[in-house]
Swiss-Prot record:
The keyword Membrane applies. Residues 41-59, 115-208 are extracellular. This is Tetraspanin-6. The lineage of its organism: Eukaryota, Metazoa, Chordata, Craniata, Vertebrata. Glycans are attached at residue 134.
């Protein structure tokens, strides 16, 4: 059995670690809420862009939503484990944090490696959407119209991309290409936006995904602090229990 003075020295350390870990866990829980919000925002605001990418890319917002939800649940568990001062629960908390950190790290590496494929996928699918465009409104045609209306652009590289499509042969440029709402006749190139959409869309995606990547990277690095704190508190609690015995 350890001396009473030794146990008195250990208890303030445990109290200090508990206080810091509780503050950390609360902030960690907030980051989960932020990731959840970013995922929902990405699903709503970037849906038109994602719909012209491959199916894997459309899952990005859902991955963020799922990650945010897991972090919220894990943060709640971490708070409970800290308040209970349970060594095994804190070790489990640290293990989960490590697992999520590794998953986020792998996801970031994969996203960086395949970033050029995302550009090529978008360009190819946008060109295909133009070839198959119809005004009745399948989801890709709707995405094309939404992008061209919002960004004031026309075609992939420029407005001339439309001249090779069946839609142009029958009806001319789509209304979403028009500089004004009424640009009849719709074959008049002077009345449509000349700039292509590809460069504009890539600029937006890189900007918005940069925000998402920055937040995700910050959360991942922040988890290292939690792993360290949870491990230290667990060890301090275990040592204190050993000293009592």
């Amino acid at each position: 059995m350890a001396s009473p003075s030794r146990r008195l020295q250990t208890k303030p350390v445990i109290t200090c670690f508990k206080s810091v870990l509780l503050i950390y866990t609360f902030i960690f829980w907030i980051t989960g809420v932020i990731l959840l919000a970013v995922g929902i925002w990405g699903k709503v605001s970037l849906e038109n862009y994602f719909s012209l990418l491959n199916e894997k890319a459309t899952n990005v917002p859902f991955v963020l939503i799922a990650t945010g939800t897991v972090i919220i649940l894990l943060g709640t568990f971490g708070c409970f484990a800290t308040c209970r001062a349970s060594a095994w629960m804190l070790k489990l908390y640290a293990m989960f944090l490590t697992l999520i950190f590794l998953v986020e790290l792998v996801a970031a590496i994969v996203g960086f490696v395949f970033r050029h494929e995302i550009k090529n996928s978008f360009k190819n699918n946008y060109e295909k959407a133009l070839k198959q465009y119809n005004s009745t409104g399948d989801y890709r045609s709707h995405a094309v119209d939404k992008i061209q209306n919002t960004l004031h652009c026309c075609g992939v590289t420029d407005y001339r991309d439309w001249t090779d499509t069946n839609y142009y042969s029958e009806k001319g440029f789509p209304k979403s290409c028009c500089k004004l709402e009424d640009c009849t006749p719709q074959r008049d190139a002077d009345k449509v936006n000349n700039e292509g959409c590809f460069i504009k869309v890539m600029t937006i995606i890189e900007s918005e995904m940069g925000v998402v990547a920055g937040i995700s990277f910050g959360v991942a690095c922040f988890q290292l602090i939690g792993i360290f704190l949870a491990y230290c508190l667990s060890r301090a609690i275990t040592n204190n229990q050993y000293e009592i015995v």
